[in-house]
Amino acid sequence: RVLFRSIRKDNLMLWMTGEEWSKVLDISLNGFFNVTQPLLKNMLVKRYGRIVNIVSLSGIQGMPGQANYSAAKGGVIAATKALAQEVAKKKVTVNAVAPGFIRTDMTEGIDENEWKKHIPAGRFGTPEEVADLVGFLASPASSYITGEVISINGGLYT
């Protein structure tokens, strides 16, 4: 099971509305619970499962104008780590993938040429690169990896 449901409602905290805050947290953080919790029992009974949450570089380092998005993704990261400890003995792994700048609708409107200057790899990532990482984490080959947040960001760090 891979969870990726997200929206951005970027705004400086000073100008952010309660609705902008709540909507982002509801979709990302509550979405994690609402999708994951109903699937757990079956995974635990079968003694096998892979849960891969898609988070964000923003959830690791925070981004100005994205306090709501950063908080939501940071919350999913913390929940990933906690849940991994709860279910590891039943051979269920729980990990998160934290993409940086990936060419998707989430990065539309961002000046790619400007941001590429800050990325050591010199480019935005592709959805296929993220999918390859998710595929590995969903495979039997990743059975000893759990509770981890794996960044896929071309070397972009704080």
Language model feature labels by segment:
Residues 14, 61-67, 89-90, 122, ...:
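Active-site loop immediately N-terminal to the catalytic Tyr-X3-Lys motif
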Residues 56:
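Residue(s) in the substrate-gating loop at a strand-loop-helix junction
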Residues 36, 72, 80:
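Active-site helix of classical SDR
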Residues 40, 48, 124-152, 156-157:
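C-terminal substrate-recognition "lid" of short-chain dehydrogenase/reductases
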Residues 41, 85-89, 143:
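Alpha-helical segment proximal to the catalytic Tyr-Lys
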Residues 1-3:
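Short, small-residue-biased leader/transition segments that mark boundaries at the very start
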Residues 11-13, 20-22, 51, 107, ...:
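Substrate-binding pocket helix/loop in short-chain dehydrogenase/reductase
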